[in-house]
Curated annotation (Swiss-Prot):
InterPro entries: G_OBG (IPR031167), GTP-bd (IPR006073), GTP-bd_Obg/CgtA (IPR014100), GTP1_OBG_dom (IPR006169), GTP1_OBG_dom_sf (IPR036726), OBG_GTPase (IPR045086), P-loop_NTPase (IPR027417)
Binding site for Mg(2+): 173, 193
Binding site for ATP: 166-173, 191-195, 213-216, 280-283, 309-311
Subunit structure: Monomer.
Cofactor field: Mg(2+)
Superkingdom classification of source: Bacteria
Entries under PROSITE patterns matching the protein: G_OBG, OBG
Protein name (Swiss-Prot/TrEMBL): GTPase Obg
Protein's GO biological process: ribosome biogenesis
């Protein structure tokens, strides 16, 4: 399934039904009173969060959503039927923003949480509404009101508790595949991962914790370079970031600094998040070098650095223990 995490759509609520002019036509009642009914309310457009959805793909080609109009009133003071509401299901974690003003209209983070965006127009009044002592046979009526029109941007921000970040080829996909049942594409070249991968990791108590493998960031990602800018939003909701560093990289210290700089430039509190620094691929370097680079990373980051091998599944218990302590 294609991963789409942003969509611009137009939401049009239904028009209210018109009121009508009608008079009672009954046997032996030659001059019946006004009986024109009111029009029905126009349908509204309502967004509902659904845990079963992971993408905004449904809105890639469906850019205009229109709710049903209300029906006109009927004789004998019958009100017209209301227009059916249009229900749009979106993934949990979808933020809705008004394109014209930039104002956030809502943020649907819980299953079945709903938000009414475009409200249907009110139905018009039939002539029975205008009956008065001064006017016993009114012929006035009103048309239904137009429904609201909103142009909004839907933006999906994944609800993972733990985000795995790092430069391309740091081993993020391998790590999430051994920690969970996720099966991302894994290969020994940069940008294998083109979309965020999600995996549920079980805690000791049996409860699940959602991890997200974020596609490789590169220098300039916060400014739109490479793939990273498109996916940095997905770590905004995480509680912890696992910063994975390739121990066989030409300069692991420089790699660490690149990601830190991108988090700082992107802003939105990313640099303030709890971070665990993880040196991966320990099996590919000798012990002396590993000790040296670990010490330098700890001095640079002012944090404890964990050393692991995703492919050999070494050091993962210590890593998860550290994660559980911080959630």
């Amino acid at each position: 399934m294609q991963f789409i995490d942003q969509a611009n759509i137009i939401l049009k609520a239904g028009k209210g039904g018109n009121g009508i002019v009608s008079f009672r036509r009954e046997k032996f009642v030659p001059a019946g009173g006004p009986s024109g009914g009111n029009g029905g309310r126009g349908g509204s457009v309502i967004l509902i969060a659904d845990n079963n959805l992971q993408t905004l793909l449904d809105f890639k080609f469906k850019r205009e959503i229109i709710a049903k109009d209300g029906c006109k009133g009927g004789p004998n003071k019958r009100s017209g039927a209301s227009g059916e509401d249009t229900i749009l299901k979106v993934p949990c974690g979808t933020e809705i923003r008004d394109i014209k003003t930039g104002i956030i209209l809502g943020d649907l983070t819980k299953h079945k949480e709903s938000l009414t965006i475009a409200i249907g127009g009110r139905g018009g009044h039939g002539n029975a509404y205008y009956l008065s002592n001064q006017n016993r046979a009114p012929e006035s009526f009103t048309e239904g009101k137009d429904g609201e029109i909103w142009e909004v941007q839907l933006e999906l921000k994944l609800l993972a508790e733990v985000g795995i970040i790092g430069l391309p080829n740091a081993g993020k996909s391998t790590l999430i595949s051994v920690l969970s049942s996720a099966r991302p594409k894994i290969a020994n070249y940069p940008f294998t991962t083109l979309i965020p991968n999600l995996g549920v990791v079980r805690k000791i108590d049996g409860n699940g914790c959602l991890f997200a493998d974020i596609p490789g960031l590169i220098s300039g990602a916060a400014d739109g370079v490479g793939l990273g800018h498109d996916f940095l939003r997905h770590i905004q909701r995480t509680k912890i970031l696992l910063h994975l560093i390739d121990s066989i990289a030409e300069n692991p210290l420089h790699d660490f600094e690149i990601i830190e700089q991108e988090l700082q430039k992107y802003g939105k509190g990313l640099l303030d998040k709890e971070r665990i620094i993880v040196l991966n691929k320990m099996e590919l370097v000798d012990d002396d070098y590993l000790k040296i680079i670990t010490k330098k990373l700890e001095d640079l980051s002012k944090r404890k650095v964990l050393v692991i091998s995703s492919s050999l599944k070494k050091g993962l218990s210590s890593l998860l223990s550290e994660v559980w302590k911080r959630i």
